[in-house]
């Protein structure tokens, strides 16, 4: 995992740093139920897994597992405004920040999910598939 992930929207710089691996893993496990029934072929590569996971999360907005992921992503995100002001997206700053930047919210969440969780899928699905073949693997 990269030490940081930086991107800009409308002059606002977002800087994400890695969450504690075990905290991220626990929230991912709780959200795992949202991945039931997903395409096993898409889960066998890192990009596909991240896209499928992201789609599952977006389709379950409001679920407690997704709320936990949102909190983890936002807590690991710092902001730098064009004026040079910096702050972390702590729970008490979310409304203040996103009330005037609603178009940023989903992009920040999507970038954060990919950054915080995609490395858990790198190689992991292939190893899991060797232990427990998935239905799509049996077709070959």
Curated annotation (Swiss-Prot):
Pfam families: Phage_TAC_9. It comes from the Bacteria. InterPro entries: Phage_TAC_9. This is Uncharacterized protein PD_0970. It comes from Xylella fastidiosa (strain Temecula1 / ATCC 700964).
